[in-house]
Amino acid sequence: MHSLQAKILDPRLGSDYPLPAYATAGSAGLDLRAMLQEELTLEPGQTALIPTGLAIHIADPGLAALVLPRSGLGHKHGIVLGNLVGLIDSDYQGELMISCWNRGQSTFRIAVGERIAQLVLVPVMQAHFQLVESFDESQRGAGGFGHSGSH
């Protein structure tokens, strides 16, 4: 298991509400909580920036973190991330904030301490451009947007 530096920015995290943890041995994501001062109401179409009460420093340029929606919130209530996926660079040290978007048809209430997103650590490979005049031919070429078939 990889070690990750973390700072608790909201004292309720770790006392009133559990620290992020893997739910099972096979879980890929750590749940992030809405560390709000009071319950928040999201009307259909509305977005809000939600604090997690947690800052991390990955420190390893070979790693990054992704903030992803929780499947149940999206499927059952239409609550997804406003930016669809959050990317946390290895050198970022600020608070993790969650952009929540109510794409559903009903008002949704986010309770203080509710699990609203998940954090997944992923490997990163940085690349540099090798500028060329043309590419070696591939079977696909420049075809896109359904070019490879529908089934």
From Swiss-Prot:
EC number: 3.6.1.23
UniProt-listed GO biological process terms: dUMP biosynthetic process; dUTP catabolic process
Pathway(s) the chain acts in: Pyrimidine metabolism; dUMP biosynthesis; dUMP from dCTP (dUTP route): step 2/2
Highest taxon of source: Bacteria
Principal EC category: hydrolase
Function description: This enzyme is involved in nucleotide metabolism: it produces dUMP, the immediate precursor of thymidine nucleotides and it decreases the intracellular concentration of dUTP so that uracil cannot be incorporated into DNA.
Full protein name: Deoxyuridine 5'-triphosphate nucleotidohydrolase
Protein's organism: Azotobacter vinelandii (strain DJ / ATCC BAA-1303)
